[in-house]
Amino acid sequence: MARYRHNRSRSRSRHRRRRRGHRGGRYRRRRRRGRYGHRRHHRGHSRRRRKRRRSRH
């Protein structure tokens, strides 16, 4: 349970897991999410760190 590492001090029975697939609800945020939603780090297409491959002719 690496996701909840910061909640270690709490007792386990008290910690409720988030339900997956439940969107919105009472306190839905109005702001639209960015490109990748709620994920902090997206390791996909980063333009910066790619070396250019030499094409073989």
From Swiss-Prot:
Belongs to the protamine P1 family. The keyword Electron transport does not apply. It comes from Alligator mississippiensis (American alligator). InterPro entries: Protamine_P1 (IPR000221). Testis. GO terms for molecular function: DNA binding. The keyword Nucleus applies. This is Sperm protamine P1-type. It is found in: Nucleus; Chromosome. Protamines substitute for histones in the chromatin of sperm during the haploid phase of spermatogenesis. They compact sperm DNA into a highly condensed, stable and inactive complex. One of its GO terms (cellular component) is nucleosome. Keywords: Chromosome, Developmental protein, Differentiation, DNA condensation, DNA-binding, Nucleosome core, Nucleus, Spermatogenesis. One of its GO terms (biological process) is chromosome condensation. It comes from the Eukaryota. Residues 1-57 are annotated as: Disordered.
